[in-house]
Amino acid sequence: RLLKEGKMTNIISTCCPSVNDLIEKYYPKLVPMMAPVVSPMAAHGRLIKSIYGGDVKVVFLGPCIAKKEEAIGDERVRGAVDAILTFEEITKWWSAQGIDIHQCEDQPAGNPDPGVNQLYPISGGVIQSVLAGTDEGHYYKVHIDGLKNCMELFEELEKGEIQDCFFEVNVCEGGCIKGPASDKWRQSLVRAKMDIEKQV
């Protein structure tokens, strides 16, 4: 909708809580460029509670430690998610319980096939999946990842010389898939990206 309306000078994605904090604390002039939408974690949590009732507990599993602060420290999303476990914490939990995931039987999740939306956690995944096939109006789509690159972009945006762009921005290089609690030492970025893209 935001892209079709075309009212914003630039649009900065608000999926990454580290990006949101960075802008709000160090680049406050750019706050009007932030997409006025909650993160996918918050949106999904709210959707689950609207379908199954307010007394259901939602637990988010992922590679991002910043999501913990988002869930408890950001008034805009408070209550959407009840607990957050990182992949690292889950792995340690399984180990403490003597669970070897490789010995477990595969079970289908029973959810609808997410299709291209599985690309979301890799750099450029929002553009490739969520915005794929949408009318982007006059906006040029760009994805930026890595803290240094994000800061360079924000400095350029503060100068006011860049217009009519949609920026998908992630602090983690490679996107969420390479988050700090993703067991990243076990898999290269290229391998992680290939594994996700093969599933689509």
Where are the predicted features?
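Iron-sulfur-associated redox domains of electron-transfer enzymes in respiratory
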Residues: R1-V200
